[in-house]
């Protein structure tokens, strides 16, 4: 027998104007050219380790993870990469070879955390890109 939950509101298809907004590409977020990539890397390492330690529990492996992510970030920045999306992809790709077996985290969580920290530093809302 089919049961219908009447407490759930009916969902209608979005209006054409809303649908058009949903199909618009998300504009890229570009970081300013690096003035001191090593200093940026140290800032990122410290912030990422603090985030890792706060998110679950402080672990020795968090320092290694933050150091590795910061190294990738610095190298990418020194090679001229300023696009946030490309930086995130580079971190995901290169962190895949990292052994996360002693951690609660994985490469996607690390790349997303880096993205959030960078957006926050730029004053961009993580939720809505504004």
How would you label these PLM feature ranges?
Residues 1-22:
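N-terminal chloroplast transit peptides
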């Amino acid at each position: 027998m089919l049961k219908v939950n009447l407490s759930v509101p009916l969902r209608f298809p979005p209006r054409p104007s809303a649908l058009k907004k949903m199909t618009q590409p998300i504009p890229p977020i570009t970081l300013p050219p690096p003035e001191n990539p090593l200093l940026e890397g140290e800032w990122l390492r410290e912030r990422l380790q603090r985030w890792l330690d706060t998110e679950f529990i402080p672990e020795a492996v968090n320092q290694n993870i933050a150091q590795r992510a910061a190294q990738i970030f610095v190298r990418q920045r020194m090679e001229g990469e300023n696009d946030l999306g490309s930086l995130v992809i580079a971190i995901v790709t290169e962190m895949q070879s990292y052994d996360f077996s002693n951690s609660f985290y994985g490469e996607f969580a690390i790349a997303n955390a880096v993205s959030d920290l960078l957006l926050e530093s730029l004053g961009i809302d993580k939720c809505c890109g504004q």
